[in-house]
Amino acid sequence: MDESIDDVQETRTIAIPLKDSHEDEVIEINCSELPDGEEVLQILEAEEAKLSYWIEVALEYYRQDRVDLFMMILESAGSRAGLEYEGVKQDQMRALDILAAYWMTQGYREKAKDKKSDFFSKATVLFNTADKIAMYEWSHLTVRAWFYLFERDKSTNKYELADQQFNYVVKTNPKNVLPLIGKAVIAFNKKDYKTAIYYFRKAIRQCRHTIADLRVGIGHCFAKMGMMDKAKTAFERAMEIEPYNVSAMCGLGIILLNTYDHDSLKHAVSLFGRSYNLQTDHPVALIHLANHFFFKKEIERAWTLAWHAATYNDCDSIKAEAFYQMGRCRHAQGQFDGAYKYYYQARQANNGEHTLAHYGLGQMYIHRNEIEEAIKCFDTVHKRLPNNTDTMKILGSLYAHVQLNDPAQTAEARQKGRDVLGKYLAVENDDYEACIDLAQLLEATDPKRSLELYENAIDLLVTNESIQPQPEMLNNVGALYMSMKQYEKAEHHFKRAKERLEEQLNTDEGSLLLERRSAPEKSHLLTIRYNLALCLEHLCRTVEAEQMYKDIVKECPGYIDGYLRLGCITRDRHQVYESSLWLKQGVQFDQASPIVWTLIGNLHFAKNEWMPAQKKFEFILSKIFNNKIPDPYSLVALGNVWFEQLLNPSRKKEDEKKYIDRALQMYQKALKLQPKNMYAANGIGCVLAYKRNWNDARDVFSQVRESTSEFYDVWLNIAHVCMEREQWMAAVQMYSSAMKKFRKENDSTLQHYLAKAYYRANMLNEAKEALECAMLDQLDNTQLKFNYAIVLKKSAKEVLRGHKMTSEQVTAAIDDLKFADKIFQYISKNDDRQSSHTGMRISRTICAEEAKNCKDLLTQAKHKLAAAQTQDEEERRLMEKQEKEKIALQNKMIEEARAKEEAEKQKLEDMKNLRLSFIEMTKDVLRLPEIVEEKRRGGGGRKRRNDDGDEFVNDSSDAGNYDGEEGGEDGERRERRKKDKAAKKASRKKRERRDSGGPDSNRRDEKKRKRKEERDRKLQEKLSAKQSAKIKSRAFLSSSESSDDDKPKPAADSSDDEVDPRPPVDEFDSPTRTDSDSDRETTTKKKKKKAVVDSDEGSVSGSGSGSDNDDKPIIGGSDDDDDDKPAGGNSRDSDGSDAPKKKVIESDSD
């Protein structure tokens, strides 16, 4: 409003009219020397001054900062002012709005919440009273809308109410500045900065005074939009208008701080200092000065300034920044409890929007060892600042070392750590600490990448820091190499780690370290030595490994892993007794170790000692795990024990059901404990297959293979089920796939299985090859030999049964029968070789019978061999005969092709000779007209031609021809021009046919065109080039009246240079014509026609009317115009319609 508290024009005097004065008598109150409040009240009351004068006097006191008198006058005006005049309602509303605005301003500035609420309540009462007088007055709505902005924290819809009222005021009074500023403020708080700038600029244009705060608002909008140059310009402009504007100084100082320039930083600090001197409680100046003194190590001074900023301000974001500065000061002083307190307040002050507060609070949580809370804080920072490398490094390290109660959550944290550290190393690839953390996280999931990171960290330590890697790091590198089966490199790193650790322990510093940390250092050394022995074991240097294990258990008798490895080494040497002794020694040191009891149980299981093995696994379940959480491995092992007893040939029949139930029970228990236990599921499938439930067994095995394709046994079991279901080809495929996938090409057992499948599928050659591969590994296996003989016998029998067989096939079958006979006789006569490795006995009687059958087949094979040889001989003779006939036919075809080729060559030669003779004849014909031309040049033909051509009006070139000159053009050029003219004439004929009126005219034109072309062709054959160039075409004279009679007519014997000032053109160029010319004269398009003097009319006319070139003669360039007709409306149709007549002048060529 124009008379608002901030926008009232200053007056030097206030004139108050005297009571009952008929003249203009007034009492003047000097504004520079205002009297006391009581005196002014007496004057106003005595003269019964109007309410408007009370308001003016009160505002003047407010301008002079005498607020008490201002309030006293306005509050007294309601009951003591004169109200009997027109427009008093408006003044009453005005007085209420001024009072409400005062209380509104006081409430906005008040820090105490209770007082703030009281001030706003008083303003609300006054505004409600003013609403009863004139609710929709624009000045009242403006002030009330600003009141909504001031108390916006009480209700969420205050912005909407204020915006609605501002919109109404702007529509009612568009030039009012206050609603424009209010809309700009609302748009700024809604983060619609472009709209805010629009309203700020509009307010500046409407404002009668230059207000610096509007420029400050524009600067803040540009800063929020990231347009720092424009923001800087706005703040500088505000300071030009008002040099002591604190907000402009602070805004400009913040921009200068972000330039990171030394001079700019000094200027920014000076601006903040000036702001502080002008307004000591300005929070922005206080905060930035606190930040400045913090970096100058004046911590207490920085903390004091930050404390004042937090005390003198109610803005949540500024309070959060102030608390953060206070927490940082306490953090730098080592007062971590105080730092935690202020960081926490900074986070809570602005609803967690202050990012750096989360960072500092996370550091305090790390100091308190509250890793999970620290992870939450740094995770928040990382989401808001995803490219901050410091946050990524700290967060990744926290994820790498946190230990959560839930294993799934721990695994998830590890994965997040991998992601964060990987992103960090992509930016900072020279941080060895991050490399080590990420390498530790990747040891189990990506050993190759982990190894690269470890090696990179070692290189960075050696090159950048000149620090030798620690033994623990070298040990980890060796373990990774060993997991990747690079045992030589693993051995190298284990030895380096061992030497490095021993070197540290032998030094004086290392000795002190050993006294302080003797147990960890010894354990590290034992671990490195154990890993080195394990690596040597993988390198097949078992003697060295065994000695190292013995040294380890001797030095540290309680190192149970050494006993386990010694037991395994002796077990692999088939020294079962010594293996059991080592394992029993391990049991002495650790009675509750399930691994030791498991290895002992496996020893009994390997020796088919079912009862001892059963007791060991039952001991593990009952004593070690107390039947609370059973060991899945022991359950599966017990199931295997019961199932193996089913396969024992000496088992009792009545115990079969008990074994099946117990084995199935153990497998099911293990599967319930570990639903993904493939060994338990495979055991259930084996029990179902034993019960001949082939479909169910196949389903179980298939599910196991779907879950993991690296389980070799399940592939074999699926193939076995296919064999039992007589699916021979499927079994062959499964056996072959398992052999390729698991690289079992040299496995004799698998080859034996495959051979059986081939045999069942009647693929005898493949079965023979598979058995041969199997026998290479087990030469003493009687069962393999027997099966090989069976295959040889059956293969030979199949050959002998065939109707068509060669002598080679019969000979091979005889050899197979002989070898099979030897195998059967060998097995039947040797008692010590008649049992297979599975314990299954091969009957000698059957072998003897098979040998006898082989001999019978050999007898039959001799007759088959003779017949096969006879048949082979006949086939050989037939093949020779066919080959001879084939060769004779090929020779005949070659001879025919040669004769045809010679005939073609002769034909081409004849055609070539004929063409040469034709060319010679043509040359004679072409020379003949030149001789005639020479004779005629001296005769009377020239005179006759000149006489006949008197009617032509020629250009200079044509005139030269009539004089016997060539006009500077040779014969070759004239020939080319004639060809061009002929082509253009043919094109014009086509257009005339297309534009002509009916089919009769088309036929007549076509006939004339053909006759003319035939005549031209004959003429060209008779005349030479020079003669052809001298023949002139016929011209026609149009009788059209469309040409201009008043134009001068060119002389027939004058040249183009004299008549037409235009540059000379070629006689084939087309004159420029209008569209009307094209409509009436299609025959003259792109051609020049010679104008002819008509003897009857004595006038020269062009080829059409209305043309721009009617004053020039149209030169015809064709010599066959006797058949041309004017096109369009100027020609006569076939039905005899009238048209302008043309007089045809024929040349001597006709």
UniProtKB/Swiss-Prot annotation:
Residues 993-1005, 1013-1024, 1060-1084, 1132-1150 have a biased composition (Basic and acidic residues). It holds the Pfam family TPR_19. Component of the PAF1 complex which is a multifunctional complex involved in transcription initiation via genetic interactions with TATA-binding proteins, elongation and transcription-coupled histone modification. Ctr-9 is required for epidermal microtubule organization during morphogenesis. Keywords: Coiled coil, Nucleus, Repeat, TPR repeat. It comes from Caenorhabditis elegans. PANTHER family: RNA POLYMERASE-ASSOCIATED PROTEIN CTR9, RNA POLYMERASE-ASSOCIATED PROTEIN CTR9 HOMOLOG. It is found in: Nucleus. Its main location: nucleus. PROSITE patterns: TPR, TPR_REGION. This is RNA polymerase-associated protein CTR9. One of its GO terms (molecular function) is RNA polymerase II complex binding. TPR repeats lie at residues 143-176, 177-210, 212-245, 247-282, 320-353, 355-388, 432-464, 471-504, 594-627, 643-677, 679-711, 712-745, 748-781. Disruption phenotype: RNAi-mediated knock-down is mostly embryonic lethal. Embryogenesis proceeds more slowly, with embryos displaying defects in the positioning and shape of epidermal cells. Randomly orientated microtubules are present in epidermal cells during the epidermal elongation process. F-actin accumulation is visible at the leading edge during ventral closure and circumferential actin bundles are present in epidermal cells. Decreased expression of pafo-1, increased cytoplasmic expression of leo-1 and increased nuclear expression of rtfo-1. Component of the PAF1 complex which consists of at least cdc-73, ctr-9, leo-1, pafo-1 and rtfo-1. Residues 975-992 have a biased composition (Basic residues). Gene3D superfamilies: Tetratricopeptide repeat domain. One of its GO terms (biological process) is regulation of DNA-templated transcription. The gene is ctr-9. Residues 848-916, 972-1028 form a coiled coil. GO terms for cellular component: Cdc73/Paf1 complex; nucleus. Residues 935-1150 are annotated as: Disordered.
